[in-house]
A protein has these predicted regions:
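Low-complexity, Pro/Ser/Thr- and charge-rich linker/hinge segments at domain boundaries
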Residues: 74-98, 104
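Ligand-binding face of N-terminal immunoglobulin V-set domains in extracellular IgSF glycoproteins
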Residues: 38-43, 51-55
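Short beta-strand edge segments in extracellular beta-sheet folds
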Residues: 69-75, 184
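Aromatic sugar-binding surface patches on proteins
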Residues: 33-40, 150-161
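Beta-strand signatures of extracellular beta-sandwich domains
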Residues: 14-18, 132-136, 171
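Short acidic/polar inter-strand loop motif in beta-rich domains
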Residues: 58-66, 173-182
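Short amphipathic, basic-aromatic surface patches that mediate peripheral association
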Residues: 4-7, 112-126
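Surface-exposed, short loops/turns at beta-strand junctions within beta-sandwich domains
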Residues: 43-49, 161-166
Length: 184
């Protein structure tokens, strides 16, 4: 899912996304700070064909809503995690791989986090997913916050656009209280 609210650049305070017909509808709640472009890309799971909706709140309190239809064969939310079938996945839990790509007015961060993102819909496997993320500068100031929900794919891939040449780190927490950090 790629969301681009750059038409409202400088005014975006919050972006919400959900999949109407998914068993777990919420996808993310993104709050970009002034040093981030109002863009976000993230891989998600879809159970069946569904409308995807995004609501963008601007400083004036207005919500701007857009949508698209996603066609899917189905089963994405109720399929067991491929990650759990891989030997040693626990040792890689929370590892972040990523790269920074130069752009005209800053850079794009593209990250992948090792995590099964279990949504609790597979028998015998409880919810276990990343639910909080913050992009911070080297001083620890929050540049953006991101609340994630179990509709996000396992080993989630996230792309963010940062203004300027800010050195950053990613902080993550899952619903079991595990915390992870990566310098980017």
């Amino acid at each position: 899912l790629q969301v681009d609210a750059s038409a409202y650049a400088g005014d975006v305070v919050r972006m919400l996304a959900w999949a109407e017909l998914n068993p777990i509808a919420q996808i993310f709640d993104f709050r970009p700070g002034p040093l981030l472009q109002p863009t976000l890309a993230i891989r998600i799971r879809i159970e069946q064909a569904t409308p995807i909706r995004v609501a963008v709140q601007t400083r004036d309190g207005l919500w701007h809503v857009g949508s698209t239809q996603i066609d899917a064969a189905g089963g994405g939310c109720t399929a067991p995690s491929v990650v759990r079938a891989q030997a040693g996945w626990e040792e890689r839990l929370g590892q972040v791989q990523g790269q920074r790509f130069a752009q005209a007015e800053g850079s794009r961060l593209r990250l992948q986090v090792a995590h099964p993102m279990d949504n609790g819909l597979v028998g015998g496997i409880p919810e276990f997913f990343l639910n909080q993320a913050q992009l911070r500068d080297r001083s620890g100031n929050t540049l953006a916050s991101l609340e994630l929900f179990p509709a996000v794919s396992e080993n989630p891939t996230i792309s963010l656009d940062v203004k300027g040449n800010v050195e950053t780190e990613l902080w993550l927490r899952d619903n079991n209280g595990n915390e992870f950090k990566a310098e980017l």
